[in-house]
Amino acid sequence: MLIARNLSCSRGRRQILSGIDLTLPAGEMVGVLGANGAGKSTLLGTLAGELPGDDAAVSLCNRPLTDWPVDELARSRAVLPQSPGLGFDLGVTEVVAMGGYPFPEMGKHTLDTLLDRALALADVAHLATRSYQSLSGGEQQRVQFARALVQVLACRTADSYRALLLDEPISSLDPRHQLQLLGTARNLCHTDALAVLVVLHDVNLAARWCDRLVLLADGRTVASGTPADVLTPPNLATVYGIPATVMESPVHRGVPMVVFG
């Protein structure tokens, strides 16, 4: 399990995260919410081992994250950054196949099967013969999601812990693909026992798809728990600085729906 205990992080004299506690168990999807500059991406990057935080504040499978070699870490977690750049052009299938790089022992047939599954799950199979640079921003985002899926699904031993860390993965997607991506991530929590952490701005999508939410403000946890426990008018006003009305979704029973303003 990925665990943060009293995690703090600073850049120069600026404190970005302070005293964050978070657990990410297998089979659960956790959403991170907050206004711009709240520390959401820094939290995800620190949990991924890509940004420095307090030594030993983060552990993966009962081992400090700082003790994990990069190649071993890549076999246990996959990261979809907010702006996944690619400085050179490759075919879509080549980009998705990058997710298999941490697994050199994987045979071609196994990789091809995994590629087909990831391309279908991300709804980019029809783009497989295209060049990456020819795609729209939303299409590129889905291709990168497929790459992360290959990486996180490649390790399939019975006792393996696998975390999928997604930083604003729907920022360039149309409504259909937003629902599809989040639904895919949620389904994989259940079918493949993945642990998923996702940074989002849409509180209603977070409420619908996430098992738990973490609400941040100024690098601190304002609330953590179920969507119903976290998405309250006082919490939302504290974080976003505007009034909020919370009601039950008329479409999804038991799911809170937030209206701002």
Swiss-Prot record:
SUPFAM superfamilies per record: P-loop containing nucleoside triphosphate hydrolases
Chain ranges of the ABC transporter domain: 2-243
Chief location category: membrane
Pfam families registered for this protein in UniProt: ABC_tran
One GO cellular component term: plasma membrane
Lipid bilayer topology: Peripheral membrane protein
Keywords recorded for this protein, A-Z: ATP-binding, Cell inner membrane, Cell membrane, Membrane, Nucleotide-binding, Plasmid, Translocase, Transport
Top EC category: translocase
Residues holding ATP: G34, A35, N36, G37, A38, G39, K40, S41
Annotated compartments: Cell inner membrane
Domain of life, source organism: Bacteria
GO molecular function, one term: ATP hydrolysis activity
SMART domains assigned: AAA
Family per similarity comment: Belongs to the ABC transporter superfamily. Heme (hemin) importer (TC 3.A.1.14.5) family.
Known role: Part of the ABC transporter complex HmuTUV involved in hemin import. Responsible for energy coupling to the transport system.
Xref: PANTHER family: HEMIN IMPORT ATP-BINDING PROTEIN HMUV (PTHR42794:SF1)
Quaternary context: The complex is composed of two ATP-binding proteins (HmuV), two transmembrane proteins (HmuU) and a solute-binding protein (HmuT).
Protein known as: Hemin import ATP-binding protein HmuV
Source organism (scientific name): Cupriavidus metallidurans (strain ATCC 43123 / DSM 2839 / NBRC 102507 / CH34) (Ralstonia metallidurans)
